Amino acid sequence: ARKHTQYVQIFKNCGPSAGMSIRHSHWQVMGLPIVPRRAAVMAENMQEDDCLFCKMLTYEKEQKKRIAAETEHFLAITPYAGRFPYELWLAPKAHQRDFGDMNDAERKDLACLLWEMLQKVTSLKKDVGYNICVMDGPRNRDFHWHIEILPRIGGFAGFEYATDCFICMVSPERAARYYRGEAEE
């Protein structure tokens, strides 16, 4: 990394509704000289000795209502206050600062989980767009990396843009049931 790069964002836009501008499949990597506000706030709460993200994963595992899938090394959860219908986070169970810190077994486990979850995302509706964001920590800061999958169902309007508050029409519990393959009542 260059010395002026403070934050690196890895992402993929799939489909026109998700901002895809080039038709072939590709990932993008951007290095920023600043730390985005959301990443900075998250980093403040993810210190290894007192990681809010670790606590959230422990809570979700105990409650089981918002667990979409679980593997040996990862949890897939539908976040309590998601911004998008069927939003999904894939996170290592153990505290890991960087996406690059995985060993071979963890990489294989993540690849299988990501594939499984993307099959379900793309089955939500015909030609659904989605974004995949690898959320790594700011340079030289502790963090709990994770992947966010953001299906682009519905859209933002004036309220969301004006307030940075999101109205999500699908509860995270309902989304988790969908990802687990449970029939709706």
Task: Report each predicted region and the residues it spans.
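HIT superfamily nucleotide-processing domains
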Residues: 1-185
